């Protein structure tokens, strides 16, 4: 979940800044073609900037430390396990990091398979058995081997393009009028207000689509973990998370697997644990 939140937050920030620039300067002009070209350029700029900053931002957000030289048995086990799984998945060895947090959490990020990162919290290492942690690591390795971050960036770029394009086409129509001479004029104030409101509304709809795709990716990563270490280990890891959820108040934590059941599934980046376990059992 962390990698998704960071990606979307960065993307939204870039989109907001670029959207204000477009609205204030009127760079795209009034023509549909001009708006479409600018929507493509600015839409993909937000997602690609988010993608290439994802690894650095993720590490900084959790104050993670990349393991360059294992200092203890746990770090050695992590490096050996990730190395073995990466080789089996056919991808280059990613960087491995540990960060201090009581949350049971792990995530993978990075712009390319050759420049990726797998990070694990101390909470996960302290609350899971080696078999369960191995399954979680395999899940993250599967995200990398599936190219999920790149695919997510491309999808977000397309969604951004539609958000920008539709909001500005509608805003242009609403703000445009004809004077007594038959010349078309446009109220910049109305255009700015309408385009910003529509961008926020369409942005919510785009987020629903992005979250649906994220849930689909999680099922694929679970299946990938099952192929790397066996589905029983992955089921055990998810069941462990269920047990922890029952005994700890983890609501609001950035967790790679834990899902807050009070939220609508439409806005979940991960499917409910019950559905994931059921899907694994049906493999």
From Swiss-Prot:
InterPro entries: HtpX_protease, Pept_M48_protease_HtpX, Peptidase_M48. CDD domains: M48B_HtpX_like (cd07335). GO terms for biological process: proteolysis. The chain crosses the membrane at residues 4-24, 33-53, 147-167, 190-210. One of its GO terms (cellular component) is plasma membrane. Its EC number is 3.4.24.-. GO terms for molecular function: metalloendopeptidase activity; zinc ion binding. It is found in: Cell inner membrane. Its cofactor is Zn(2+). Belongs to the peptidase M48B family. This is Protease HtpX. It comes from Haemophilus influenzae (strain PittEE).
């Amino acid at each position: 979940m962390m990698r998704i939140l960071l990606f979307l937050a960065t993307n939204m920030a870039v989109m907001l800044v670029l959207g204000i620039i477009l609205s204030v300067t009127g760079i795209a002009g009034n023509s549909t073609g001009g708006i479409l070209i600018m929507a493509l350029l600015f839409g993909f700029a937000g997602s690609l900037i988010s993608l290439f900053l994802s690894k650095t931002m993720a590490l900084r957000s959790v104050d993670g430390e990349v393991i360059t030289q294992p200092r203890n048995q746990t770090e050695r086990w992590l490096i050996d396990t990730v190395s073995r799984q990466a080789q089996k998945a056919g991808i280059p060895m990613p960087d491995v990091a540990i960060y201090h947090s009581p949350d049971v959490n792990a995530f993978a990020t990075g712009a390319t398979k050759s420049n990726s990162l797998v990070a694990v919290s101390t909470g996960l290492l302290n609350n899971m058995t080696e078999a369960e942690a191995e399954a979680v690591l395999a899940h993250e390795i599967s995200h990398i081997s599936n190219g999920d971050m790149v695919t997510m960036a491309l999808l977000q770029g397309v969604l951004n393009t539609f958000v920008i394009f539709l909001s500005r086409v509608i805003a242009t129509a609403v703000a445009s009028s004809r004077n007594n001479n038959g010349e078309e004029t446009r109220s910049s104030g109305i255009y700015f207000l309408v385009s910003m409101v529509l961008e926020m509304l369409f942005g919510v709809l785009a987020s629903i689509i992005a979250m649906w795709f994220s849930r689909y990716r999680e099922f694929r990563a679970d299946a990938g973990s099952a192929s790397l270490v066996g589905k029983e280990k992955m089921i055990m890891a998810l069941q462990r998370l269920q047990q922890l959820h029952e005994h700890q108040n983890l609501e609001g934590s950035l967790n790679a697997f834990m899902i807050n059941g009070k939220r609508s599934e439409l806005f979940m980046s991960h499917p409910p644990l019950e559905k994931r376990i059921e899907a694994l059992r049906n493999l």
